[in-house]
Amino acid sequence: MRFKGLDLNLLVALDALMTERKLTAAARSINLSQPAMSAAITRLRTYFRDELFTMNGRELVPTPRAEALAPAVREALLHIHLSIISWDPFNPAQSDRSFRIILSDFMTLMFLERVVVRVAREAPAVSFELLPFSDEPDELLRRGDVDFLILPEMFMSHTHPRAKLFDERFVCVSCPTNQKLPPQLSIDNYVSMGHVAAQFGKQRPSVEEWLLREHGLRRRVEVAVPGFTMIPSFLSGTDRIATLPLRLAMHFAKAIPLRITELPQPIFPAFTEAVQWPAPHSSDPASLWMREIFLQEASRVEFQSETSAHALSKADGAIRHP
């Protein structure tokens, strides 16, 4: 099929070449022979009047023109796939759809687990692939390489739709034998003490780190770990402190002795956990179904949070108010 002189099959070839960066792998990914893919490159070069790719050993290196074309080509193919090719009535009970989701271990434990349990009942063949945090989640959304981002709203792109899940706040946690933590935690105390901190990606700050930077503050991180769930192990028997979402602190306090203390305000206001999806997925029936489940299960999490302050007072570690 041609559109204004361009064979649209060539866009599929261009997308494969940009993704694989190797001729043989790109040809294999779209079921072409290597000679056919070489011919496609020649035709692409002729149409766009650009070399598009140069060879560096066996790797294809895109030119600036190819780099500029790639996002629009990927988005166009994604729209065609979702709006025309895969547009079928969605039957959860019969679907074998797989959803790729980026989220923290906190949201996995406190939110997604309940989602997965429900989906197992309603759509037993639907599966999930949980991905680690990326420093470029916007790029993954744009390419359609991920179905959902679940993360604090402050870190979300403004170019893709989103929906609020629930609000959360931070508390300070420590070993009950911590000798350095004062009864009333000031911001000076907080930044001067040794911290165990979660890191997500090489460049993206955690929420608490972002909030501190907003006030021109910096804490002393003694142990950095790739997620919240490892934090309690590095508090035990030490005078370190850590900053955790309240729900997660309550979850840990059921099994691990923890001292839970309120953080100094207004440095650490409540924040919003939200879900975001690629704009082309907005009308995809499977995505719509999954988003509805997210929102329904999030409303149940929110309901439970109404009693969190009362529950916190009964936790293994007592909350202390500054």
Curated annotation (Swiss-Prot):
SUPFAM superfamilies assigned to the protein according to its UniProt record, in alphabetical order: Periplasmic binding protein-like II (SSF53850), Winged helix' DNA-binding domain (SSF46785)
Keywords, sorted A to Z: Activator, DNA-binding, Nodulation, Plasmid, Repressor, Transcription, Transcription regulation
Claim: Transcription regulation is one of the keywords in the record: yes
Any GO MF annotation of the entry: DNA binding
Superkingdom of origin organism: Bacteria
Residue ranges flagged as DNA-binding region: 23-42
All residue ranges annotated as the HTH lysR-type domain in the record: 6-63
PANTHER family assigned to the protein according to its UniProt record, in alphabetical order: HTH-TYPE TRANSCRIPTIONAL REGULATOR LEUO (PTHR30118:SF6), HTH-TYPE TRANSCRIPTIONAL REGULATOR LEUO-RELATED (PTHR30118)
Function: Regulates the expression of the nod abcFE genes which encode other nodulation proteins. NodD is also a negative regulator of its own expression. Binds flavonoids as inducers.
Family membership: Belongs to the LysR transcriptional regulatory family.
Protein's recorded name: Nodulation protein D 1
Organism: Sinorhizobium fredii (strain NBRC 101917 / NGR234)
